[in-house]
Amino acid sequence: MNAHATPTPAHEIDPTGATPVMAQFFEMKARQPDALIFFRMGDFYELFFDDAYKAAAALGISQTFRGTHNGQPIPMAGVPQHAAEAYLSKLIRLGFKVAVCEQMEDPAEAKKRGSKAVVRRDIVRVVTPGTLTEDGLLDARGANRLAAVALRAGQAAVASVELSTGEVEVLAVAKEGVAPILAALAPSETLVADRLLSDDSLSQTLRICGGLVQPMPSALSEPQASETRVKRLYGVETLDGFGGLSPAEIGALGLIAAHLEMTQAGRLPALRAPRRAADADVMAIDPATRSSLEIDRTQSGDRNGSLLAAIDRTVTAGGARMLASRLARPLLDVAAIDQRLDAVEWFVEHRQLRQRLREVLKGAGDMARALSRLALGRGGPRDLGCIRDTLKVGERLAGMAGGAPDPLSPPPFELEHAFKALTPALHEGLSQFLTTLEHGLGPDLPALARDGGFVAAGVRPELDQARGLRDDSRKVIAALESQLALESGVPLKIRHNGVLGYFVEATAGKADPLFQPPLNATFIHRQTLANQVRFTTVELADLDARIAQAAERALAMEVAAFEDWREQARLLADAIQIASEALARIDVASSLAEWAEDAGAVRPVVDASYAFDAKAARHPVVEAAVKRAGEPYTPNDCRLDASGETAARLSIVTGPNMAGKSTFLRQNALLAILAQSGCYVPAASFRLGVVDRLFSRVGAGDDLARGRSTFMMEMVETASILTQAGPRSLVILDEIGRGTATYDGLAIAWACAEALHDTNRCRALFATHYHELATLETRMAFVSNLSLRAKEWNGDLVFLHEAAPGPADRSYGVQVAKLAGVPAPVVVRAREVLDRLESKDQSPAKLDDLPLFAVSQAVAVTSAPAKAAPSAVETSLADLDVDGMSPREALEALYRLKGLLTA
């Protein structure tokens, strides 16, 4: 067998005859056949058989062989325990599932059962993308959600859990509403009953925005089984307290409960009660729109360059995640939006207090994730320290808010509620727990409880005594070393290792007296090496035992203290989670106020109208980039009204390439997202009637996997818009029809514009190079024209980036080609062809249909003239017998034909 041999799956290998350790491995593999088994052996996690091949290839580590099974070498690979997180992270990103099998006892404990006893091992967790909790495996500023989709009686539901913070949400949606909800949640892993994967539309949705899709046995989503699991997860007798969940909602939550039972090995996370929502509560943004607008990631997957990166001034991890969540799901409820805006405005008005609060906030840790790790048994003293320090930050913030500079301007509802939640005095148990941690935790906290040294001195007298013996052992050992050297007259040292414990060591050349009477009665020989000889004494052995026992007792007492405090944290989980959320709310509101001040943003007016009225608005991302380059940004106005009362509902946007049409479209879509997320907007003023659905058709690419061209993808997205947009929707369309023949494209664009105006009756911006669409302004009641201006100056094209009423006079495509560096001869030839085409287009005949069809007629007349009589040359050519001519006759015929042409 060699490293490149095709591996046989471990669960297909006959375990008969396995050694006790390998028998343990086979047992674990049988329990998790589709996972890589991280099998703990000492300081390493080992992988065997096909797991070893897979891990070695994925991680770039060595694959070797160790021992044999049924006469064949056992493939093996391993990673050190101290670096396991990095390897786990890579495997999870590559789509693997990993079962972590830990040693459940110390090898010394196993030996007590017999010299051949094997250390007990068990799977303590199964690591999947949606169940990560370690800081090293997570993005501190981003959520890591596990989602589940269920369908029941025509109703769909999406449930999600953020295991690292305990947040749970369940949303009842129509089947077609699953895609925008999943796109907003952006789960790392999505659970779905296997029978649903036969649904093509749902499978496509999961492929686009479901992260790793994990099929689950359909029986797990059945109502009765799901209800039982959800009750067990929350430790309740009935689900009535969660507000009358529908069968689909229970099914989705049941899938999550089943997955957590399997992956967490019986440890229940500290989950909050499910927060119920519906697709009617948030703005629907489909995956294509979300991608094109680059809300939290650019289309290349980077955070930098996104809307979120442009406005994020949060100073806590929880605040960063909350801001991202708000941008992902803008609200529809005007009152709720105003509550968020009130909080931002209060911080805008109280600048000095805001700055002081933000400085204090920087001391807050990620308390929600620390609590989750503690509840799952993965936390350590540092997590307790995080809770202690963050609760202290909350206390300080609550006290500072009480000293607001203007007593006539108390915090608005959202902030008042948050500040109260941060006052431990309002929760006696939380206040006592904070006091316990302040007095009980020492200054230097290890990551793991088993490392010890984290309980403060003076807290537990018996611990101090054990520590005293352990820590004073150096002095005692040094004194004994001096005494033995003096009594023996031999230079010696007392040393320690894990095998012999404490021992006396002398060089081989000086050790002979220790073997002779009377010293041999004191010094008991233990080991001889090449250059040293090792001994022990009765006194040293006794001291060794007492020191070891003291260290063990000290560590055991510290671990017991940790477990006590961990349990207290678990019992106070609700109060800690509420405090954590309150900190995040304060961070988000203050950070948005900070950004508003930096960006010159204003409070939007969001109401129940159908208006969209932006004055001197700017694109937040582009403006930031332009400012960094030291250049001015040109703001623009945009007015739309679906009702047609104050403005047109459809604006046709024309202008040259590179003039900024796409930026203008995206800018206005982002204004709506910001406003309904509860953010200020970069504009002189902005009024928005609530947008229920946002659609963007800006840019497209091939979907090679499904055999779809760019134009096909464009039409699919356009069809989605035309079938779903309503009067409260906002639609931005860019260059519809450009991916096909000119007349086909124009016809499609024209028909789409008519449908948006007459059927969908929504607010829409329609950017196009089909200037013929500008005539729609005179044909339809609620259509206007806007153009992004440019001018020619000394033969060069200057972009003004200014949106002005009226259509553009031309597209300036040849000038843009020149700016792009197209070779000069090509540009000159393009100008010649353009001039010729434009001269042919000057047909006086105009039709009442598409204006370009008048051009079509003119071209048709030019390209298909009436059939004329044959010329003399044609008649002569027709009479030639080409096959029967000699070379000389052919040459004479050519001269004769030439003469006819010149005659």
Curated annotation (Swiss-Prot):
<dbReference type="InterPro" id="IPR005748">
    <property type="entry name" value="DNA_mismatch_repair_MutS"/>
</dbReference>
<dbReference type="GO" id="GO:0005829">
    <property type="term" value="C:cytosol"/>
</dbReference>
<keyword id="KW-0234">DNA repair</keyword>
<keyword id="KW-0238">DNA-binding</keyword>
<dbReference type="GO" id="GO:0030983">
    <property type="term" value="F:mismatched DNA binding"/>
</dbReference>
<keyword id="KW-0067">ATP-binding</keyword>
<dbReference type="GO" id="GO:0140664">
    <property type="term" value="F:ATP-dependent DNA damage sensor activity"/>
</dbReference>
<dbReference type="InterPro" id="IPR036187">
    <property type="entry name" value="DNA_mismatch_repair_MutS_sf"/>
</dbReference>
<comment type="function">
    <text>This protein is involved in the repair of mismatches in DNA. It is possible that it carries out the mismatch recognition step. This protein has a weak ATPase activity.</text>
</comment>
<dbReference type="Pfam" id="PF05190">
    <property type="entry name" value="MutS_IV"/>
</dbReference>
<dbReference type="InterPro" id="IPR036678">
    <property type="entry name" value="MutS_con_dom_sf"/>
</dbReference>
<dbReference type="InterPro" id="IPR017261">
    <property type="entry name" value="DNA_mismatch_repair_MutS/MSH"/>
</dbReference>
<feature type="binding site">
    <location>
        <begin position="655"/>
        <end position="662"/>
    </location>
    <ligand>
        <name>ATP</name>
    </ligand>
</feature>
<dbReference type="GO" id="GO:0006298">
    <property type="term" value="P:mismatch repair"/>
</dbReference>
<dbReference type="GO" id="GO:0005524">
    <property type="term" value="F:ATP binding"/>
</dbReference>
<dbReference type="InterPro" id="IPR045076">
    <property type="entry name" value="MutS"/>
</dbReference>
<dbReference type="GO" id="GO:0003684">
    <property type="term" value="F:damaged DNA binding"/>
</dbReference>
<dbReference type="InterPro" id="IPR007860">
    <property type="entry name" value="DNA_mmatch_repair_MutS_con_dom"/>
</dbReference>
<dbReference type="InterPro" id="IPR007861">
    <property type="entry name" value="DNA_mismatch_repair_MutS_clamp"/>
</dbReference>
<protein>
    <recommendedName>
        <fullName>DNA mismatch repair protein MutS</fullName>
    </recommendedName>
</protein>
<dbReference type="Pfam" id="PF05192">
    <property type="entry name" value="MutS_III"/>
</dbReference>
<dbReference type="InterPro" id="IPR007696">
    <property type="entry name" value="DNA_mismatch_repair_MutS_core"/>
</dbReference>
<dbReference type="InterPro" id="IPR007695">
    <property type="entry name" value="DNA_mismatch_repair_MutS-lik_N"/>
</dbReference>
<dbReference type="InterPro" id="IPR000432">
    <property type="entry name" value="DNA_mismatch_repair_MutS_C"/>
</dbReference>
<dbReference type="InterPro" id="IPR016151">
    <property type="entry name" value="DNA_mismatch_repair_MutS_N"/>
</dbReference>
<dbReference type="InterPro" id="IPR027417">
    <property type="entry name" value="P-loop_NTPase"/>
</dbReference>
<keyword id="KW-0227">DNA damage</keyword>
<dbReference type="Pfam" id="PF00488">
    <property type="entry name" value="MutS_V"/>
</dbReference>
<keyword id="KW-0547">Nucleotide-binding</keyword>
<dbReference type="Pfam" id="PF05188">
    <property type="entry name" value="MutS_II"/>
</dbReference>
<dbReference type="Pfam" id="PF01624">
    <property type="entry name" value="MutS_I"/>
</dbReference>
<comment type="similarity">
    <text>Belongs to the DNA mismatch repair MutS family.</text>
</comment>
